[in-house]
C-alpha cells in the first residue's frame, strides 16, 4: 500500500511543479495580451548636460542601458563612448534608462547623472519589454533637443562600436537625409511560441511577416529620420520589439534600408575578439567591459 501512495504523491508533485513553472514563465511575459502606447506627453526625468545648438554633433550615440549596467556604462565612457572628435567630427554618447522600484538603484543613477551629465530618462519601468519606449524616448530627445545632429546611432550596453571606422564610412557614404543602415533583416516572421523571449501574439501583430528592419543591437540613421520617425510613431501599430517598431515607422515613411559597406560591418551574433578584426567592423554584440578596455589599450 505504501508504494502506490508514494507514486501518487510523486505524480502530484510533478504536476504541481509543472504548473508552477508554467505560471512563473507566463508572468515573465507581461505583454502577452496587453496594449502599451508610447505617450509623447510624458516628461523627461533626466536630460543630459549638453547644448546641440552651440556645438552640433556629427554623430549622436544612444545607448539603451539598465540600472544594473553601471560597469558597462563606465567602460563605454572610457572607450568608444568618450566624447571626442574623429576626423574633425564631434561625437557624443548618451544612455537611455527607465525607472526602477529599487530606491538604492535610483539614488545611484541620480548621482551618476549628476556626475556625468549623459543620462536620458523617463518614467516607465526599465524592463526588456519596454525597449520600444526606451528607444522612442531617445529618438524623441534627438527630435526635440538635438535635431542638428548629422547622424544618430541606437545601440546597446553590451556592444563594441568602432566609432572611428563608422565615422569614416559615413563620410564616404555622403548621405545626409533619409538614410538608415545596420544589420538588415529583410525576411523575418513573428514568433508565435508563447514562451519565447520574442513572442508576439496575433492581437499585437496580426500579420505573418515583418517589414524590413535593422537589428536593434545597432543601427545608424541620418538626423532627419529621428524627427520623421517620431512624428509618424503614433500612427503606427505599436509592438514591443523596438527594432520591428522602428521598421514599421520606416515602412510608413517609405524609407529604404541601405548597406553601409560592401563587406559585413554589423555583427549582432557576436565575433571572436581580435584587435585586427575589430578595426574593420562597426558593431559587435556580446562584448564585456573588460574586452572594450583591452581593445582601447591595444
Swiss-Prot record:
Keywords in alphabetical order: Glycoprotein, Glycosyltransferase, Golgi apparatus, Lipid metabolism, Membrane, Signal-anchor, Transferase, Transmembrane, Transmembrane helix
Record has Protein biosynthesis as a keyword? no
Q: What is its EC number?
A: 2.4.1.-
**Pathway given in the UniProt record:** Protein modification; protein glycosylation
Task: Give the GO terms filed under biological process for this record.
Answer: lipid metabolic process; protein O-linked glycosylation
Please give the residue ranges for the topological domain Cytoplasmic.
1-7
Q: Give Gene Ontology CC terms.
A: Golgi membrane
- What InterPro entries does UniProt report for this protein, alphabetically? Glyco_trans_31 (IPR002659)
Q: What is this protein called?
A: Beta-1,3-galactosyltransferase 5
> Which species is the source of this protein?
Gorilla gorilla gorilla
Q: Which gene encodes it?
A: B3GALT5
Amino acid at each position: 500500500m505504501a508504494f502506490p501512495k508514494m507514486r501518487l504523491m510523486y505524480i502530484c508533485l510533478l504536476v504541481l511543479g509543472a504548473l508552477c513553472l508554467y505560471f512563473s514563465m507566463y508572468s515573465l511575459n507581461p505583454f502577452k495580451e496587453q496594449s502599451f502606447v508610447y505617450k509623447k506627453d510624458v516628461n523627461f526625468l533626466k536630460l543630459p548636460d549638453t547644448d546641440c545648438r552651440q556645438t552640433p554633433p556629427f554623430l549622436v550615440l544612444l545607448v539603451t542601458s539598465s540600472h544594473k549596467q553601471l560597469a558597462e556604462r563606465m567602460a563605454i565612457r572610457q572607450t568608444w563612448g568618450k566624447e571626442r572628435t574623429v576626423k574633425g567630427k564631434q561625437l557624443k554618447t548618451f544612455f537611455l534608462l527607465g525607472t526602477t522600484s529599487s530606491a538604492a538603484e535610483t539614488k545611484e543613477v541620480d548621482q551618476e547623472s549628476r556626475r556625468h551629465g549623459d543620462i536620458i530618462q523617463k518614467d516607465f519601468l526599465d524592463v526588456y519589454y519596454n525597449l520600444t519606449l526606451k528607444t522612442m524616448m531617445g529618438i524623441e530627445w534627438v527630435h526635440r533637443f538635438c535635431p542638428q545632429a548629422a547622424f544618430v546611432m541606437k545601440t546597446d550596453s553590451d556592444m563594441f562600436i568602432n566609432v572611428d571606422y563608422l565615422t569614416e564610412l559615413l563620410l564616404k557614404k555622403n548621405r545626409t537625409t533619409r538614410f538608415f543602415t545596420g544589420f538588415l533583416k529583410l525576411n523575418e516572421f513573428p514568433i508565435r511560441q508563447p514562451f519565447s523571449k520574442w513572442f508576439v501574439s496575433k492581437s499585437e501583430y496580426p500579420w505573418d511577416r515583418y517589414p524590413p528592419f535593422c537589428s536593434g543591437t545597432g543601427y545608424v540613421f541620418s538626423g532627419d529620420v529621428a524627427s520623421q520617425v517620431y512624428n509618424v510613431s503614433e500612427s503606427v501599430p505599436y509592438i514591443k520589439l523596438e527594432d520591428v517598431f522602428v521598421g514599421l515607422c520606416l515602412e510608413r515613411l517609405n524609407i529604404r534600408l541601405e548597406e553601409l559597406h560592401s563587406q559585413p560591418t554589423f555583427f549582432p551574433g557576436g565575433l571572436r575578439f581580435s584587435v585586427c578584426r575589430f578595426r574593420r567592423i562597426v558593431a559587435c554584440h556580446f562584448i564585456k567591459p573588460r574586452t572594450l578596455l583591452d581593445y582601447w589599450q591595444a
